[in-house]
């Protein structure tokens, strides 16, 4: 089976799940899958995907896994006690051929947020690995190793980049579990202190790597339905995060409503309270310049703040960003697909996004065209109006 541990997922799933347990235990949600890569036929693999998901739903946390989570400073004992009883339930997920045809499949996850939040990452990893093990039966690992060595060589070649560190954010779109582990071992050996950590909790535990992550888009999206007022939903989400973590895990995600709306809400209080922010769509150079200026305008020294970049990075882009911003702020880089699925084959652009919470539509208004997903065009238009965003919905909206 592909997934053999419930820790084989991103850390931010657990940090968000703890907030859900303590503050939103009754919330119900709906997620949907989308493959953005045109011409991909996933229908022949539905039975394999279902079998892997069935196996996923049989997993439980082991005592050693629970002990590991308990040792993380921000994980609370009652959350670990809850996880000791937890398992994913197959009744909350359906996988069917899409009525649209064209080889598309529908994956719908629907149920209590607390009991569905851990589906996304392993299900995406399953879809990816099932697809590639059927379409690339003899993977060119030699090519993959060569490309990985070149990346390590490039990052380590110049002394002025000695403090430039990267982290692995590639679980969801990895070529395979076996390849993911080899990549991590190679990065550990080849980069040394320039390898900052991984978002994958299982490999963080088994390879003694620093686990990394705070919040994802789904958390701030859900707050559209959970907060007192839609216009205040981003502020509400950040305040509830601070209430749970009291200054820990202080990286705010900036692109749920776009950078303009984020900067309006990210006032002096949040500038001082949060350690930094994460970029995940739009022009990263423009984003960094605007955020640094925003900190200065709010009487915060940007050199004390962390700018995290995680949108479709490769090593040359990391180095360009580092060269632009080094010395002006603290920097962190999360590299995903370019590390864990670069063997010479076209990676699948697959996502699972929250589309409803408590029966109400929720949406992300990304800084990048094509990244938004919403099944309700009227709500998307209303959301843009509320947050003062003038650009029209992108092609993914309402699909």
UniProtKB/Swiss-Prot annotation:
Enzyme class (EC, first level): ligase
Entry superkingdom: Bacteria
Signal peptide: none
Source organism phylogeny: Bacteria, Pseudomonadati, Pseudomonadota, Betaproteobacteria, Burkholderiales
Modification after translation (UniProt): Transiently phosphorylated on a His residue during the reaction cycle. Phosphorylation strongly increases the affinity for substrates and increases the rate of nicotinate D-ribonucleotide production. Dephosphorylation regenerates the low-affinity form of the enzyme, leading to product release.
Pathways involved: Cofactor biosynthesis; NAD(+) biosynthesis; nicotinate D-ribonucleotide from nicotinate: step 1/1
Annotated InterPro entries: N/Namide_PRibTrfase, NAPRTase_N, Nic_PRibTrfase, Nic_PRibTrfase-Fam, Nicotinate_pribotase-like_C
GO molecular function: nicotinate phosphoribosyltransferase activity
Keywords, in A-Z order: Ligase, Phosphoprotein, Pyridine nucleotide biosynthesis
GO cellular component terms, semicolon-separated: cytosol
GO BP term, pick one: NAD biosynthetic process via the salvage pathway
Record PTM Phosphohistidine, positions in chain: 217
EC number(s) reported in the record: 6.3.4.21
Organism: Burkholderia mallei (strain ATCC 23344)
Protein name, UniProt field: Nicotinate phosphoribosyltransferase
């Amino acid at each position: 089976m592909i997934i053999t541990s419930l820790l084989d997922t991103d850390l931010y799933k657990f940090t968000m799940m703890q907030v859900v347990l303590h503050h939103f235990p009754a919330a119900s949600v709906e997620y949907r899958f989308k493959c953005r890569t045109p011409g991909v036929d996933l229908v022949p693999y539905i039975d394999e995907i279902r079998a892997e998901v069935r196996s996923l739903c049989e997993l439980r946390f082991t005592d050693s896994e629970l002990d590991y989570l308990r040792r993380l400073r921000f994980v609370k004992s009652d959350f670990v006690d809850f996880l000791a009883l937890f398992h994913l339930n197959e009744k909350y997920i359906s996988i069917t051929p899409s009525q649209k045809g064209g080889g598309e499949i529908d994956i719908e996850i629907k149920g209590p947020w607390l009991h569905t939040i851990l589906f996304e990452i392993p299900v995406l990893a399953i879809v990816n690995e099932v697809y590639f093990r059927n379409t690339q039966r003899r993977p060119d690992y030699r090519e993959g190793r060569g490309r990985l060595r070149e990346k390590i060589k490039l990052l380590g070649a110049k002394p002025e980049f000695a403090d430039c560190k990267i982290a692995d954010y590639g679980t969801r779109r990895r070529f395979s579990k076996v390849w993911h582990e080899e990549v991590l071992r190679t990065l550990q050996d080849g980069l040394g202190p320039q390898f900052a950590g991984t978002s994958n909790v299982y490999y963080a535990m088994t390879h003694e790597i620093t686990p990394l992550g705070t919040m994802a888009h789904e958390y701030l999206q859900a707050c559209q339905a959970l907060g007192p007022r839609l216009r205040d939903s981003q502020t509400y989400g950040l305040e509830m995060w601070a209430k749970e973590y009291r200054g820990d895990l202080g990286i705010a995600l900036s692109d749920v409503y776009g950078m303009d709306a984020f900067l309006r809400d990210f006032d002096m209080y949040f500038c001082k309270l949060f350690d930094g922010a994460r970029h995940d769509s739009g022009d990263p150079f423009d984003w960094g310049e605007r955020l640094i200026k925003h900190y200065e305008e709010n009487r915060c020294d940007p050199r004390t703040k962390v700018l995290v970049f995680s949108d479709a990075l490769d090593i040359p882009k990391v180095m360009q960003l580092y060269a632009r911003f080094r010395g002006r702020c603290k920097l962190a880089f999360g590299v995903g697909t370019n590390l864990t699925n670069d063997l010479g084959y076209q990676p699948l652009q697959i996502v699972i996004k929250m589309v409803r919470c408590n029966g109400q539509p929720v949406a992300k208004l990304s800084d990048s065209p094509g990244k938004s997903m919403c099944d309700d065009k009227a709500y998307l238009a209303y959301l843009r109006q509320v947050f003062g965003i003038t650009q029209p919905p992108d092609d993914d909206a309402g699909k």
